[in-house]
Design a protein with these regions (language model features):
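Conserved acidic residues
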Residues: 60
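Class I (Rossmann-like) S-adenosyl-L-methionine-dependent methyltransferase catalytic domain
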Residues: 6-55, 74-78, 92-160
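ABC ATPase nucleotide-binding domain "signature" loop
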Residues: 70
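A short glycine-rich, Lys/Arg-flanked "PGG" loop and its adjoining helix->strand segment in the class I
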Residues: 77-89
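A conserved beta-strand element that flanks and buttresses the S-adenosyl-L-methionine
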Residues: 63
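Conserved beta-strand/loop positions that form the S-adenosyl-L-methionine
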Residues: 3
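Intrinsic-disorder/low-complexity coil detector
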Residues: 56-57, 87
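Short catalytic micro-motifs in class I SAM-dependent methyltransferases
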Residues: 66-67
Length: 160
């Protein structure tokens, strides 16, 4: 499952490796790009939905790269639960979470959730093994070219 798939770059890679891919994004532009890009690939299914509305089917891999932090905070924990329930034992979850020092978290704390190491442990380590964690705290451009102060936790987890 490619969550918040955008232009479908992760989906394209997974398809090239033989995966069946369910991808969703709330953006009309993403829908247009992906339905055109993968129109001839029967292993690709696109859903024009948000994290809040998506019904996660059973999956061996769920990727939410640079997308999960756009989930409405009031639905965030239920979305994590639905993701967890969709994965079998040994399934992989790849997520990026904002840290507490991220510019968006500081400016709009009701819209974005910032996570500490303890928050991440509390959220995931009961049901997952942590395979990879990289913390990034640097100024990088957004797609529009504006510089943003990013504080990210990039995680790869395997379900127990």
């Amino acid at each position: 499952i490619d969550c918040g798939c955008g232009a479908g770059n992760e989906s394209a890679y997974l398809l090239s490796k033989g995966f069946n891919v369910h991808a969703f994004d709330i953006s009309i532009d993403a829908q247009k790009v992906c339905t055109d890009r993968f129109k001839d690939d029967s292993k690709f299914i696109f859903y024009h939905e948000s994290f809040e509305d998506f019904n996660f089917p059973p999956a061996s891999l769920i990727i939410a790269s640079s997308s999960l932090f756009f989930c409405n905070p009031s639905y965030f924990y239920s979305v994590i639960k639905r993701m967890t329930n969709a994965l079998p034992e040994g399934g992989i979850l790849v997520v990026d979470l904002l840290g507490t020092q991220d510019e968006w978290v500081i400016r709009e704390p009701k819209k974005f959730i910032g996570f500490t190491y303890k928050d991440i442990a509390d959220l995931f380590l009961y049901e997952f093994n942590l395979l990879f964690h990289k913390e990034m705290n640097e100024n990088l451009p957004l797609l529009n070219g504006c510089i943003k102060s990013w504080h990210l936790h990039m995680l790869i987890l395997q379900k127990n």
